[in-house]
């Protein structure tokens, strides 16, 4: 039987870096893909350069790969994700990749938000690709919330969506789950993954400001339209799948320490 080789797209991102670390610890040969200049190889990690948007370099990057963990996403230009998906799937077929594990977001099918529609379309393309697949939806990563609050706090007041619940789940724990899924058999849509506690977005912002030593007023703002209604209806959380362990408070403690 040939050796399992995992390729990680979006390998320099918040989640991708964690996936690399977890795969390396598991002793699995891992290939890290970036569209920028490849980094020097680490023990157990080989860096490759390829561009999902154009398809350049994908055939070489996927050569010999058995499983792809797809973490790449263009949040600034989300429409680019769809041609990226098509290039990824075409190259994966040519390379004979046997399993694609995709990370998605809890609520993408419940909230009519433009970026979420793109995520749903990506899930559909994967499911109809003919390539064995697994799809995991997760709630919000603390590191991304930290970055978002950092941007919002540049203003005199911090505006957050009103009556909107969030459920931060540690990105490292999600990475562990993705590697576990990649080493298993394709499972289709698997149970969602949420953090251990649910919070109002305003409370998350206030606790972040306190932990960072920042003084700002937090102002909840009602988001109009169907997307806002979806946020207020709890579309971003998954109480029945609160399987995460590390809390938001524990994450903030590590940020204070640094």
Regions found by a protein language model. Name each.
Residues 2-4, 13-14, 172-258:
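Mid/C-terminal beta-alpha module of Rossmann-like enzyme folds, strongest
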Residues 9, 82, 112-121, 164-172, ...:
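Short-chain dehydrogenase/reductase
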Residues 74-153:
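Glycine-/Pro-rich loop/turn segments that contact NAD(P) or position catalytic residues
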Residues 147-169, 173, 185:
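A conserved pocket-lining segment of Rossmann-fold NAD(P)-dependent short-chain dehydrogenase/reductase
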Residues 6-7, 11, 37-95, 105-111:
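NAD(P)H-binding glycine-rich loop region in Rossmannoid oxidoreductase-like domains
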Residues 2-28:
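N-terminal Rossmann NAD(P)H-binding glycine-rich loop of SDR-like oxidoreductase domains
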Residues 32-39, 223-226:
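Short, polar loop motifs at secondary-structure junctions
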Residues 4-5, 29, 98-99, 132, ...:
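Residues at the starts of beta-strands that form the adenosine-phosphate
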């Amino acid at each position: 039987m040939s050796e399992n080789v995992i390729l990680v797209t979006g390998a320099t991102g918040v989640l991708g870096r964690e996936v690399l670390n977890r795969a390396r610890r598991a002793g699995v040969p891992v290939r890290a893909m970036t569209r920028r200049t490849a980094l020097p190889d680490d023990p157990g990690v080989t860096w490759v350069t390829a561009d999902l948007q154009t398809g350049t370099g994908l055939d070489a990057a996927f050569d010999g790969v058995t499983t792809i963990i797809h973490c790449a996403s263009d949040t600034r230009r989300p429409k680019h994700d769809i041609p990226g998906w098509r290039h990824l799937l075409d190259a994966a077929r040519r390379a004979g990749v046997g399993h694609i594990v995709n990370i998605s977001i809890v609520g993408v099918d419940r909230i009519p938000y433009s970026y979420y529609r793109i995520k749903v379309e990506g899930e559909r393309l994967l499911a109809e690709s003919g390539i064995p697949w697994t799809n995991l939806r997760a709630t919000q990563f603390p590191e991304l919330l930290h970055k978002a609050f950092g941007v919002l706090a540049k203003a005199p007041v911090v505006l957050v969506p009103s009556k909107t619940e969030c459920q931060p789940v540690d990105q490292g724990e999600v990475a562990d789950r993705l590697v576990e899924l990649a080493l298993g058999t394709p499972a289709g849509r698997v149970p969602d993954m949420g953090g251990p506690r649910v919070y109002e977005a305003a409370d998350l912002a206030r606790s972040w400001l306190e932990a960072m030593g920042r003084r700002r007023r937090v102002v909840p703002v009602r988001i109009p339209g169907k997307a806002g209604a979806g946020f207020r209806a709890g579309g971003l959380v998954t109480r029945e799948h609160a399987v995460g362990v590390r809390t938001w408070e524990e994450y903030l403690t590590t940020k204070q320490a640094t």
